[in-house]
UniProtKB/Swiss-Prot annotation:
Lineage: Eukaryota, Metazoa, Chordata, Craniata, Vertebrata
Residue spans of biased composition, Polar residues class: 147-185, 194-203, 217-230
Gene3D superfamilies named among the record's database cross-references: 2.30.30.100
Phosphoprotein as UniProt keyword: yes
Gene label: LSM14A
Job of this protein: Essential for formation of P-bodies, cytoplasmic structures that provide storage sites for translationally inactive mRNAs and protect them from degradation. Acts as a repressor of mRNA translation. May play a role in mitotic spindle assembly.
A biological process term (GO) from this entry: P-body assembly
Protein name, per record: Protein LSM14 homolog A
Basic residues composition bias: residue spans: 269-283
Residues of the Sm domain: 1-81
Cellular component aspect of the GO annotation: cytoplasm; cytoplasmic stress granule; mitotic spindle; P-body; ribonucleoprotein complex
Region (Disordered): 147-288, 322-361, 398-448
Highest taxon above the source species: Eukaryota
Self-association and partners: Component of a ribonucleoprotein (RNP) complex. Interacts with DDX6. Interacts with EIF4ENIF1/4E-T; promoting EIF4ENIF1/4E-T localization to P-bodies. Interacts (via FFD box) with EDC4.
Entry's family note: Belongs to the LSM14 family.
Amino acid sequence: MSGGTPYIGSKISLISKAEIRYEGILYTIDTENSTVALAKVRSFGTEDRPTDRPIPPRDEVFEYIIFRGSDIKDLTVCEPPKPQCSLPQDPAIVQSSLGSSTSSFQSMGSYGPFGRMPTYSQFSPSSLVGQQFGAVGVAGSSLTSFGTETSNSGTLPQSSAVGSAFTQDTRSLKTQLSQGRSSPQLDPLRKSPTMEQAVQTASAHLPAPAAVGRRSPVSTRPLPSTSQKAGENPEHRRAEVHKVSRPENEQLRNDNKRQVAPGAPSAPRRGRGGHRGGRGRFGIRRDGPMKFEKDFDFESANAQFNKEEIDREFHNKLKLKEDKLEKQEKPVNGEDKGDSGVDTQNSEGNADEEDPLGPNCYYDKTKSFFDNISCDDNRERRPTWAEERRLNAETFGIPLRPNRGRGGYRGRGGLGFRGGRGRGGGRGGTFTAPRGFRGGFRGGRGGREFADFEYRKDNKVAA
């Protein structure tokens, strides 16, 4: 692990732009995202450096902190990396892990053959904030709390199971550095702008890896078995984690859908001051527009109509209408005219005579100046409201419901003007009338009217 960068594993002293000094072991450097990760980090505060916000030193030791490169002011190497203590090439060894020394901060321990961090068995809960932070959004991460490490940590026996579980945590740290992700829940509570993440393992029982970007609660699930091979491909394991995360996300969406009961009515939302769309829907065909295979045949359509029957039916209607006119007591517009010459022509003999021109004669100037076509006296009654509405629906279609907004403009200005209150408006039809003003200009309410100004002005001038 230290072959690519010679300072990996060195003890680093870092000063941020907030004048806070940190000391820790250099874990990794991400050149793509310009971040630096330190392990076993301790904060020494501002240490009499000039700053607007002095920070006292802290006794807690953080598991690791990722710093943003643009916010680092100074970085020095305190101690070179410790020499690696490698085991002999024994084919019987599958995995190995060294326990920590008595001092958790001064002694780093040795890196394993796969570049993983040494594990520790005893941790204490955090006394820093008294709150738990969300898990880092990386695959396989089980680090859930922002905790501290005790200075007296016990010796962990060489257990391949713990080493295998911690390998997943170190691999997740590499993934976190390469992807540049950070937990959004850490931002409001971090003390320095350079601190991106400070996460510690919760307990000696490491839970199973969590899905990508999801919060993993602390669990007491037993450790994975020791049958995991040391030479397992890490890319294959990452692919498995990404495959598992998708069904879990789908299950989470399904659970959210089940929370809403199918028969429970949802509370309506009423917009104030905005507009609320109509509830009606257009009659849209689901199968798309109609498709015509051939052109319309006008000749065959006209052949279906029997013109003789239509003419016969039309004449029968005219005869019935004339019979109704004859039954009326007064002739059509015969007595309305005040002309004496016309009255003499409309004598009793002419009234009893039959029309020589036949029933198709609609205008006879000898009888009256007016014709029978434009006369409305033959109507028995006016159409009712229901008939008129039905006729309008057949002609123009069914209108949509009008938008029923609530609100409007209500201004309380000076000089006696008062805005409308958004009441009233048309109801029914396809167009909603604009909200009318209630009161219009309403003077004398805490203000002055124009008449008062003129009156006082005249008094001053007169005085």
